[in-house]
Amino acid sequence: MERSAVASGFHRNYILCASRAATSTTRLHSLSSLRNFPSSSLRIRHCPSPISSNFIVSEVSRNRRCDAVSSSTTDVTELAEIDWDKIDFGLKPTDYMYAMKCSRDGEFSQGQLQPFGNIDINPAAGVLNYGQGLFEGLKAYRKQDGNILLFRPEENAIRMRNGAERMCMPSPTVEQFVEAVKTTVLANKRWIPPPGKGSLYIRPLLMGTGAVLGLAPAPEYTFLIFVSPVGNYFKEGVAPINLIVETEFHRATPGGTGGVKTIGNYAAVLKAQSIAKAKGYSDVLYLDCLHKRYLEEVSSCNIFIVKDNVISTPEIKGTILPGITRKSIIEVARSQGFKVEERNVTVDELVEADEVFCTGTAVVLSPVGSITYKSQRFSYGEDGFGTVSKQLYTSLTSLQMGLSEDNMNWTVQLS
């Protein structure tokens, strides 16, 4: 029986080719060699070869959908050998990652898949010395029929390009980003959890990997994607979480980088988050640094409050990340007749709120059971999952998982 990649780290005997038969070479061909067919028509099947556990990513007819596995062979690997009922939100090494490079003044091209593993990087790299790096996060879901859904990947591509401009970095085009995501997901298809068991978390990275000693943009950049099957982000699952309002530390400042997904934003919240978790809280809710009375966001997700069926969330003004799940929830809520306000939300409004919830790629929509502010604890509902937040959670997750019709045209299906 084939060893799980969780134990081995990654498989070194995978090959990528554009034919239906195994070849004698194990070189990973560049993406440019596969441009004669779309990445969404790739599938992994067992390759008859004297080398055990050889797989190829093979071309599928454009005129029909691709089955989850090849019907012409019985020796296939549909799912990785892990306990899908016990996965959490943690890294589980998969088979492939995707990499693409360019110079500071150049363009990204010739990306390729390679076995998942460590990367070589110069100790003088811009990302290590000056934090010149961005990341994104999105998910792939397996449908009941075996097809795979991505959720608004072009939005992540656009957000990365906006962040790259702020950080003086070149960025892949939207088309390059989306095709790279498709290619990486399909190459790791067996790691996508069964329906209802979780999702495949996709982590695109953009880093200044060229060596630079003085403070300046790096001379070379790497775009990389790796993936991991995940369960719920919070240990509580979809149960209510408990937040504490942070009054000493701040996540972002006006004119800073709080509105882009740069890596430094997340290192900066670890101290306050660690203190909060040591006290038994799930996470931290930050206030603005000027007045210390307006809600901003949680460490890694946006915040919403509900009062009398009116939904309010802090407006995007440079210090808050423009979350894609946030944007989607707002659009879903408005399509269902809810009034949604994007405005300054004061911390005092937490006292009277009927419901509070967080949104983000990792958490999707997480109900807030309580918020503690200056030693006062405010609770929301009997179980924290209010009527409005439950309705929005169900609507969004049903759409993401392919359980309801996508009238928004947000999902991208891979066969």
Swiss-Prot record:
Pathway(s) where this gene product acts: Amino-acid biosynthesis; L-isoleucine biosynthesis; L-isoleucine from 2-oxobutanoate: step 4/4; Amino-acid biosynthesis; L-leucine biosynthesis; L-leucine from 3-methyl-2-oxobutanoate: step 4/4; Amino-acid biosynthesis; L-valine biosynthesis; L-valine from pyruvate: step 4/4
Location of this chain's protein in the cell: Plastid, Chloroplast
Enzyme class: transferase
Alphabetical list of InterPro entries matching this protein: Aminotrans_IV, Aminotrans_IV_CS, Aminotransferase-like, B_amino_transII, BCAT-like_C, BCAT-like_N, BCAT_family
Modified residues (N6-(pyridoxal phosphate)lysine): 261
Reactions the enzyme catalyzes: L-leucine + 2-oxoglutarate = 4-methyl-2-oxopentanoate + L-glutamate; L-isoleucine + 2-oxoglutarate = (S)-3-methyl-2-oxopentanoate + L-glutamate; L-valine + 2-oxoglutarate = 3-methyl-2-oxobutanoate + L-glutamate
Cofactor annotation: pyridoxal 5'-phosphate
EC number: 2.6.1.42
Listed GO biological process terms: isoleucine biosynthetic process; L-leucine biosynthetic process; L-valine biosynthetic process
GO MF, one example: L-isoleucine-2-oxoglutarate transaminase activity
Any one of the GO CC terms: chloroplast
Transit peptide: 1-65
Assigned keywords, A-Z: Amino-acid biosynthesis, Aminotransferase, Branched-chain amino acid biosynthesis, Chloroplast, Plastid, Pyridoxal phosphate, Transferase, Transit peptide
Pfam families noted in UniProt: Aminotran_4
Entries under NCBIfam families matching the protein: ilvE_II, PRK13357.1
Other known facts: Branched-chain amino acids are synthesized in chloroplasts, whereas the degradation takes place in mitochondria.
Family in the record: Belongs to the class-IV pyridoxal-phosphate-dependent aminotransferase family.
Protein's job: Converts 2-oxo acids to branched-chain amino acids. Acts on leucine, isoleucine and valine.
Protein name: Branched-chain-amino-acid aminotransferase 5, chloroplastic
Organism lineage: Eukaryota, Viridiplantae, Streptophyta, Embryophyta, Tracheophyta
